Amino acid sequence: MRSAFYIFLVVAVLARCSVVAAFTNADDSQLLSKVSPDFAANDMTYTVSRKRLLRVAGREDDDATTDEEDRGFTSIVDVIKRSDAAEALHKLSKASAKKVKKAGKAVKELTAKEKEALKALLALKDGN
C-alpha cells in the first residue's frame, strides 16, 4: 500500500514539474490555449442544432407551455385516484371480481380507459 502511495507521489511531482516548465516557457504556454481550426469550425456548425435540441417542433405559442404546466397538477390527482382505485380493487373478493368481469363483458361499448381498468382488475385478482 505504501509503495503505491510513493509511486503516486513521484508521478504527481514529475507531472507538476513538467507543467510548470511548460508554463515558464512562453512559446509552450500559448500552444495550450490555441484552438485547432477544425474544432472551431465544427463548434460553429453545430451551435444552432444544440440550441434547438430540446424544443418541440410546431409549437410557437406560449399558451401551450401554460397548458402543459396545468396538466402536471391534474396528473398528480389522477395518480391519487388510481391508487385509491387499486386499494379498492384489492379489497374485492374473487366473486365480486367475477361479477365485475361479467358486467364488463355484457357491455359492448367500453372506452379504452374502462378496458384498461378491467384488465388491471383481472390482473390484480389473478395475482392473489
From Swiss-Prot:
Gene Ontology cellular component list? extracellular region; host cell nucleus
Where in or outside the cell? Secreted; Host nucleus
Entry keywords, A to Z: Host nucleus, Secreted, Signal, Virulence
Q: Where is this motif: RxLR-dEER?
A: 52-71
Annotated signal sequence range: 1-22
Family note: Belongs to the RxLR effector family.
Per the record, the domain comment is: The RxLR-dEER motif acts to carry the protein into the host cell cytoplasm through binding to cell surface phosphatidylinositol-3-phosphate.
Name by which UniProt lists this protein: RxLR effector protein SFI2
Identify the species of origin. Answer: Phytophthora infestans (strain T30-4) (Potato late blight agent)
Gene name of this polypeptide:
SFI2
